[in-house]
Amino acid sequence: VGNEINNQYWNYMGDLDVSAYTVKFQRAFRVFYTAMKSVSANDNVMFSIDHYWNMLPEAAPVGKYKGKDILLAFHNYEATEGYMDYGLALHPYPYPMTSPNFWDDDKTGKVNDTMDSPVVNFKNLHVITDFMQMESMRNRKGQVRKIFLTEEGFTSTQGGKDKSIDQAAAVAYSYFIADNNPYITAYLMSRQEDSVDETKNGLAFGLSKIVNNKLVPKRAHEVFKYIDNASATEGTADFARAVIGIDSWDQLIPGFHFPGRE
């Protein structure tokens, strides 16, 4: 319900502080939540925030809030005004979005392993799941609320240079991070094909590009197609280790297992 609600670019309500803005959104969310649960009790109902966790979004000229502040305000109002078993959707894009190599994002000074990290993405995804594991953030049953990665993408170009191999490596590595985190429920890519407008701005997120009005798969397309195939995933992602600069995946992901091989 709503898109990246910590940025009024998508959810305009005027000049409001985070408290006033969130209470209005929470009440609208409750209408949708109640309606959906009334006809399908097992549905997951969630709201999304972008990767700006403990800093204000840098784009858009309208009201902007820290994702962490929005989440806490929503959670507190939910506790006050009536229980909802809401879920959280996160859009963990690289920082900056014009580079696919999220594994180097700590060098920007915006991505770290603390709960006060300015940005949360795949480099430090555990920050959001650690936060949601806190007793104060759990649902009424004491369970960690479901977390969905409902929009992520990695550009295949950077500064006019081809970065399709880096993009493919980013898809493999990010999927492995999500699959090895027991608190992540879903992983959804943002683009099947490149958006013309986004590509002009250096954001070639598609798994395929368009050439002469036809889809041409990138390397990332093959990776995404086979990444959760237990018999193919290891070979499909083998190239990515050299791109990232590691010998084995457990150097980066403690207790690593390939998808389907638990």
Predicted regions and their residues:
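Noncatalytic carbohydrate-binding groove/subsite architecture in carbohydrate-active enzymes
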Residues: S19-K161
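Aromatic-lined carbohydrate-binding surfaces of glycoside hydrolases
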Residues: N3-N7, Y52-W53
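Conserved residues at the C-terminal ends of beta-strands
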Residues: V1-N3, H91, S190
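Aromatic-rich peripheral "rim/lid" segments of glycoside hydrolase catalytic domains that contact
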Residues: I5, Y9-N11, S19, G159-E262
